Swiss-Prot record:
InterPro entries reported for this sequence: DUF520, UPF0234-like_C, UPF0234_N, YajQ-like_sf
Family per similarity comment: Belongs to the YajQ family.
Name of the protein: Nucleotide-binding protein NT01EI_1072
Gene Ontology terms, MF aspect: nucleotide binding
NCBIfam families in the cross-refs: PRK05412.1
GO cellular component terms listed in the entry, alphabetical order: cytosol
Keyword Magnesium in record: no
Function: Nucleotide-binding protein.
Matching Pfam families: DUF520
Biological source species: Edwardsiella ictaluri (strain 93-146)
Top-level taxon in the UniProt lineage: Bacteria
Keywords, ordered alphabetically: Nucleotide-binding
Length: 163
């Protein structure tokens, strides 16, 4: 029986490259001259800390980072960015979290979405991924198109396609 897995993964090496590119752009941008601003990746916690002297510039930093991530092939939805900036002393900062894995709530939403579509496939939650099994390849491709088309706020990848 053909099957595939739905996962949500982020390549940390590409994130590191995007952060370095954003830092490089910070050094050359006119509006960030003589401004204390930084973009730091914490690989252990899988977070990116954006720090600068005003909340407006934090939003600019977020836009720069998103642009660099998209150029490196990482969807902007892979970053979970809080609306409010933290203010400490003279600096504003935002700690963006990388979304990796499919949590149980999102997995249940995906299962419900696929079951409500009346496709002839079965879904199983396996930890932080979802296994979709069907009798025909066409049904599986329909499920892939359905998941791609759904706006669930998190990017998904498909791997381990078996025939």
């Amino acid at each position: 029986m053909p099957s595939f897995d739905i996962v949500s993964e982020v390549d940390l090496q590409e994130v590191r490259n995007a952060v370095e590119n954003a830092t490089r752009e910070l050094a050359s941008r006119w509006d960030f001259r003589n401004v204390e601003a930084s973009v730091e990746l914490n690989e252990k916690n899988e977070t990116i800390k954006l720090t600068t002297i005003s909340d407006f510039q934090v939003k600019q930093l977020v836009d720069i980072l998103r642009e660099k991530l998209v150029k490196r092939g990482i969807e902007a939805g892979a970053l979970e960015i809080p609306e409010e900036c933290e203010h400490s002393g003279k600096l504003y900062s935002v700690e963006a979290k990388l979304q990796k894995g499919i949590d149980s709530v999102m997995a249940k939403k995906l299962v419900k979405l696929i079951k409500d579509s009346k496709l002839k496939v079965q879904t199983q939650i396996q930890g932080e991924q979802l296994r979709v099994t069907g009798k025909s390849r066409d049904d599986l491709q329909g499920a892939m198109a359905l998941v791609r088309g759904a706006d669930l706020g998190q990017p998904f990848q498909f791997n381990n396609f078996r025939d």
